[in-house]
């Protein structure tokens, strides 16, 4: 029989994942040979990704199933439960994706994205795909955000920058951000393109203690404007913007 100790040692050795709290282990022959673990807690590398209360299928190499002393697997499939992804550990996550040789898929999972231990947003019934190529490492998340289909992509590009894409089609929201991070993303700068209900925003920004917005541009059906300013997070969220209208579409006011 496959023991929890053998499974934990194999997953740690081959995928650098710590696994705990295995409540049950079942062997399934169909649709392919696999071990099914229930109630498990997974910690990827140094807490770059955490999965709790999940159902885990370890898809075994068919040629090795007769040897119970060795676990040779091709893929890990994680279902249900919830996952925690820390955005400020994006570089470590991309490094993990690049080094990992085993396929890892996450399905029907609630996914919580954190920034400095604060929740950014949560996607329910989510599907996560980790992929790597010579030029990019990429994290794809698809699921529901307030019952609306949502697509979130985190991509590490060959030039060292990070691209973040968020799309919620039903709400007419589309966001694309390119980040240049320093000190594990404690400080960063970048370019944001945001479209909300036919309103288009573009601006450069620098994040240190606060977020400084530069060279901002707003285009809507009624007005085009330039803007700059600063966004504050302490002691509470607030912002100050200097807005300079450049074009007023008076025809849309009638």
Segments predicted by a language model, with ranges:
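Hydrophobic residues embedded in beta-strands of well-ordered beta-sheets
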Residues: 83, 135-139, 160-162, 186-188, ...
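Flexible beta-edge/linker motif
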Residues: 20-117, 122, 131, 137-140, ...
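Amphipathic hydrophobic-ligand
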Residues: 17-20, 45-60, 88-91, 116-129, ...
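Transmembrane beta-strand segments that form the barrel wall of outer-membrane beta-barrel proteins
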Residues: 106-111, 162-167, 187-193, 211-218
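Short alpha-helix boundary/capping motifs
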Residues: 2, 133, 195-196
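Short beta-strand element of the conserved SAM-dependent methyltransferase core
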Residues: 42, 78, 83, 130, ...
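Short, ordered beta-strand-loop transition motifs
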Residues: 29-31, 131-135, 156-159, 182-185, ...
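N-terminal type II signal-anchor transmembrane helix
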Residues: 1-16, 47-49
């Amino acid at each position: 029989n496959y023991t929890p100790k053998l499974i934990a040692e194999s997953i740690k050795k081959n995928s650098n994942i710590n696994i705990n709290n295995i409540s049950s282990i079942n062997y399934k022959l169909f649709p392919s040979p696999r071990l099914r673990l229930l109630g498990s807690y997974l910690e990827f590398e140094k807490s770059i990704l955490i999965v709790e209360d999940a159902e885990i299928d370890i898809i075994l190499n068919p040629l090795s199933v007769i040897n119970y002393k060795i676990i040779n697997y091709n893929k890990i499939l994680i279902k249900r439960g919830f996952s925690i992804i820390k955005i400020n550990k994006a570089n470590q996550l991309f490094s993990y994706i690049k080094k990992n040789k085993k396929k890892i898929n996450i399905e029907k999972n609630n996914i919580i994205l954190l920034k400095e231990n604060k929740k950014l947003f949560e996607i329910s019934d989510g599907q996560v795909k980790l992929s790597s190529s010579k030029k990019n490492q990429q994290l794809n998340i698809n699921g529901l955000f307030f019952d609306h289909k949502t697509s979130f992509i985190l991509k590490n590009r060959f030039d060292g920058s990070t691209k973040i894409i968020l799309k919620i089609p039903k709400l007419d929201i589309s966001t694309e951000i390119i980040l240049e991070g320093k000190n594990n993303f404690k400080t960063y700068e970048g370019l944001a393109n945001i479209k909300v209900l036919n309103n288009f925003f573009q601006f450069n920004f620098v994040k240190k203690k606060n977020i400084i917005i530069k060279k901002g541009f707003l285009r809507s059906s009624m007005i085009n404007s330039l803007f700059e300013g600063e966004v504050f997070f302490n002691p509470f969220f607030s912002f100050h913007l200097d807005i300079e209208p450049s074009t007023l579409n008076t025809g849309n006011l009638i």
